[in-house]
Curated annotation (Swiss-Prot):
It comes from Drosophila melanogaster. Binds 1 lipoyl cofactor covalently. Belongs to the GcvH family. The gene is ppl. Its main location: mitochondrion. Residues 57-139 form the Lipoyl-binding domain. CDD domains: GCS_H. It holds the Pfam family GCV_H. Its cofactor is (R)-lipoate. This is Glycine cleavage system H protein, mitochondrial.
Length: 165
């Protein structure tokens, strides 16, 4: 304890000599809530997710629950870049050995990229639905639409209440 006290005293003396402002006097910078939410994934009741990655660009995919329900995905049809989408538009399809499912856009905007790796290797949807298995990128037309989508906690509650796990 004596060592810490001596060390602190030496540090304060050095700070005074160097004209360093003590930490308590430093003003905190404001952090905008939108920057904190930028990496938050939002979900639809049809099991698609959307995550803002930068500015108005977002990536879209299907949830872990959806990929498990589909089974081994063997085919992916994704929207072409340049396609204008409205929220809830059907924009693609995923087929597995046991089922087929349409993909709906969780947000309005213009498709800026499709995940060609998923079209070449559809199993990425199963092995990495949130990282490598995303479906397409979109330039958001109306970012406010994100507010109506479910947070991760709300989505988990939705799955529990609907009997889906």
């Amino acid at each position: 304890m004596v060592f810490i006290t001596k060390f602190a005293r030496i540090g304060l003396q050095a700070a005074r000599q160097l004209s360093v402002t003590p930490l308590g006097a430093v003003q905190a910078r404001a952090i905008h809530l939108t920057s904190l939410l930028a990496k938050e994934r939002r979900y639809t009741n049809k099991h698609e997710w959307v995550e803002v990655v930068s500015g108005s660009n977002a990536i879209v995919g299907i949830s872990s629950y959806a990929q498990e329900a589909l089974g081994d995905v063997v085919f992916a049809q994704l929207p072409e870049p340049g396609t204008e989408l409205k929220q809830d538009d059907e924009c693609g399809a995923l087929e597995s050995v046991k089922a087929a499912s349409e993909v709906y856009s969780p947000v309005s905007g213009k498709v800026i990229e499709k995940n060609a790796e998923v079209e070449d290797t559809p199993a990425l949807v199963n092995s990495s639905c949130y990282e490598k298995g995303w479906l397409f990128k979109v330039d958001l037309k109306n970012p406010k639409e994100l507010e109506a989508l479910m947070t991760e906690d709300q989505y988990k509650a939705f799955l529990s209440s609907s009997g889906d796990h």
